[in-house]
Amino acid sequence: MASVGNPATILLVDDDEAVRGFTRRILIQQGFNVIEASDGAEALEVASVYAQPIDLLLTDVIMPKVNGLLLAQGMLQERPGIRVLYMSGYVEKSLLVAKYPESILLQKPFTPQTLIAAVRQVFASEEQP
C-alpha cells in the first residue's frame, strides 16, 4: 500500500455513473486518492498518463469496450505491483475464482461497509508473507 502518511491511490472503473459516484464518495471519505474511468479502454488511457503509483484497480467486470478481466490483465502488465478488486452484479464469484484463484469479488449492490471491508482485505493480503 502507499507509504505511511500517503494515502493509497485507487483507479475506480465502472460504466455506471451512479455506482462510480457512490463508490468514489465512500473511498474519498476513507482517505483514499481516487482516479476514475467509465470503461476499461478509458482506464488504460488514464493509467498510461498517470505518473504516480496506482495501488488498487477497483473495476466492474462487465463493461463495454474492454471488460474488467482484460483491463486487469493489461494493468498488471503495465503496473505489476497493482492490486485488483473486481465488482459485479452479474458474475458468480465461483466462476471468477475458478479462472483467477487470487481474485476478490465485491458483489453489487454493496454497502459502504462492505466496500471498505473488501478494500482493506485486498491491502491486508498484500501485507501477508
Predicted feature locations:
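Active-site residues of response regulator receiver
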Residues: 60
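Acidic catalytic/metal-coordinating carboxylates
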Residues: 38-42, 66-71
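Non-catalytic signal-transmission and effector/linker regions of two-component phosphorelay proteins
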Residues: 1-11, 24, 48, 53, ...
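Receiver (REC) domain active-site loop signature in two-component systems and cognate sites
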Residues: 63
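A Lys-centered signature of the CheY-like receiver
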Residues: 108
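Acidic, metal-coordinating helix/loop segments flanking the phosphotransfer/catalytic sites
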Residues: 36-56
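Charged docking surfaces used in two-component/phosphorelay signaling
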Residues: 21-29
